[in-house]
């Protein structure tokens, strides 16, 4: 039986798991920026959505997206190692993109570690295009590949 994972907004009780996943899967080798306290701050931020998937009460994936005046910015997206290649990342990303469209935003922008070809390939598969590189983006130590996706166009909304 295939079960579609449930996506929900994170609550402060999820912050520790999110922070630990960020440290292990995203911030490896860089120090720890997305601590539990910072995740809690994002959870309470009105311009940010923190979404999670869970299995048996444990966080299996998460995404953090900030909504600006002109575009959304995917801050972090991570899936626990034992739950990858099952579509969780794509589901979380699509959920966050739908929130951005609901907010009236045309584009999502993100940065991926240049030394993480799997992440870059994932975003390309999800319809993102490379928009450049940012030298030393991650604490001056690791370059980033900037990716962007147009979610809709004002012309799409015209009668």
Q: For the regions a protein language model found, what residue spans apply to each?
A:
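Short secondary-structure capping/turn micro-motifs that flank functional sites
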Residues: 38-39, 116-117, 139-140
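Residue-level recognition of the GNAT/N-acetyltransferase active site
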Residues: 80, 84, 111-113
